[in-house]
């Protein structure tokens, strides 16, 4: 029984580490759009550019004892900026990954300067 518990803990730890690896926005966004469109019907798939922008932004790590609010405010600054400035550059028919990615990067720069 103890061995089974240890195996489950090790596998869970490996899965958590795999999930924590960050995929660059430029790679995540087009794949997310394809998956979102395939899993949605009109008019729901019209939200895919926003959904994928939110999903592909680098989210902060889970809170720890040493974390502070700056990490979260930086993420929400990027999300707000990307939603306002970048989502409209993309559609299901024309993902415009290069422009959206550059726009999201500029949001990262703007938000980093503010914090």
From Swiss-Prot:
It is found in: Secreted. InterPro entries: THNL. Residues 1-20 form the signal peptide. Keywords: Disulfide bond, Plant defense, Secreted, Signal. It comes from the Eukaryota. One of its GO terms (cellular component) is extracellular region. Is disulfide-linked. GO terms for biological process: defense response. Belongs to the plant thionin (TC 1.C.44) family. May be involved in plant defense. This is Thionin-like protein 2.
């Amino acid at each position: 029984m103890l061995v089974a518990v240890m195996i489950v803990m090790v596998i869970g730890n490996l899965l958590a580490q795999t999930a924590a690896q960050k995929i660059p926005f430029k790679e995540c966004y087009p794949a997310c759009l394809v998956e979102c469109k395939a899993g949605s019907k009109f008019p729901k798939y019209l939200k895919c550019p926003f959904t994928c922008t939110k999903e592909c932004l680098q989210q902060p790590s889970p809170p720890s004892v040493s974390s502070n609010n700056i990490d979260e405010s930086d993420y929400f600054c990027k999300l707000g900026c990307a939603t306002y400035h970048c989502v409209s550059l993309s559609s299901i028919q024309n993902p415009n990954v290069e422009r959206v990615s550059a726009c999201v990067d500029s949001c990262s720069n703007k938000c980093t300067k503010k914090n």
